[in-house]
Amino acid sequence: MPSNICKFFLTWWLIQQVTGLTGPLMLDTAPNAFDDQYEGCVNKMEEKAPLLLKEDFNKSEKLKVAWEEAKKRWNNIKPSMSYPKGFNDFHGTALVAYTGSIGVDFNRAVREFKENPGQFHYKAFHYYLTRALQLLSNGDCHSVYRGTKTRFHYTGAGSVRFGQFTSSSLSKTVAQSPEFFSDDGTLFIIKTCLGVYIKEFSFYPDQEEVLIPGYEVYQKVRTQGYNEIFLDSPKRKKSNYNCLYSSAGTRESCVSLFLVVLTSLLVQLLCLAEP
């Protein structure tokens, strides 16, 4: 009996871990993503984030290297840039770093956060990147394009969001270039009101990038043909977590994280109990 129970839960857990390996990906509300907006705890996070960043560096050499590379570029470009009050070197470095090699691994960790929160080594990076976009946002909306090599499917019902930070371009030509798009993929045509034009920060300014936070919600979704999806946002946000890594974390966020970790532990304990 313990063996059957173990197999059942282990199978269920593995299914939760594997997404998008075959067939199209579902375009939904990204329920597994880490989507903190840090509302009401910015001051506490500004104090705590440098310590969290050191902890993340100790657990991820890749992040440490990417951060140092981005820091050099930020120090070179910041004298010629203007940025809002409260925007500091941590915010600038995080934004530059995202456009480099760390972006793919970071977004994977953000998307899969709920599946393995104990292995999330981007606590400070997520905060600094989120805060950078919040500070730079001026309320302007942008019409942008995002090409992917993966096919996405929309059920036809309900609002959607990306969950992860999402790179897009003002240029349709860039979005449809072979580097980002294939005939088997999806072309997103997006109206974003929370996305920020970050060309000046990017390692690749020719990409004309607009970076969209994962918590932006699109209430108007329309498909066209077999590989085009139109998304329209009326400046709406949605987050399942808030201030999780500050002492001001909401009860709901802490309970949610506790349940995720508890589920993982139960699966492991059931398997260990097998004779």
Swiss-Prot record:
The SS bond pairs are C41-C243, C141-C193
Cross-referenced PROSITE patterns: ART, TR_MART
For this UniProt entry, the molecular function terms from Gene Ontology, in alphabetical order, are: hydrolase activity, acting on glycosyl bonds; NAD+ nucleosidase activity; NAD+ poly-ADP-ribosyltransferase activity; NAD+-protein-arginine ADP-ribosyltransferase activity; nucleotidyltransferase activity
Q: InterPro entries of this UniProt entry?
A: ADP-ribosyltransferase_ARG, ART
Q: Which Pfam families match?
A: ART
Which residue range or ranges hold the TR mART core domain?
61-238
Q: Where is the lipid attached (GPI-anchor amidated serine)?
A: S246
Biological process annotations from GO: NAD catabolic process
Tell me the first and last residues of the signal peptide. Answer: 1-20
Expressed in which tissues? Postthymic T-cells.
Binding-site list for NAD(+): Y98, R146, Q164, S202
Q: How does it sit in the membrane?
A: Lipid-anchor; GPI-anchor
UniProt-reported outcome of changing Q207E = Increased ADP-ribosyltransferase activity
Q: What positions constitute the catalytic site?
A: R146, S167, E209
Q: Please list the residues that make up the propeptide.
A: 247-275
Entry EC number(s): 2.4.2.31, 3.2.2.5
Compartment annotation: Cell membrane
Keyword Transcription carried by entry: no
Keyword annotations from UniProtKB, A to Z: Cell membrane, Disulfide bond, Glycoprotein, Glycosyltransferase, GPI-anchor, Hydrolase, Lipoprotein, Membrane, NAD, NADP, Nucleotidyltransferase, Signal, Transferase
Q: What does this protein do?
A: Has NAD(+) glycohydrolase activity and extremely low ADP-ribosyltransferase activity.
Q: Which family does it belong to?
A: Belongs to the Arg-specific ADP-ribosyltransferase family.
Q: What is this protein called?
A: T-cell ecto-ADP-ribosyltransferase 1
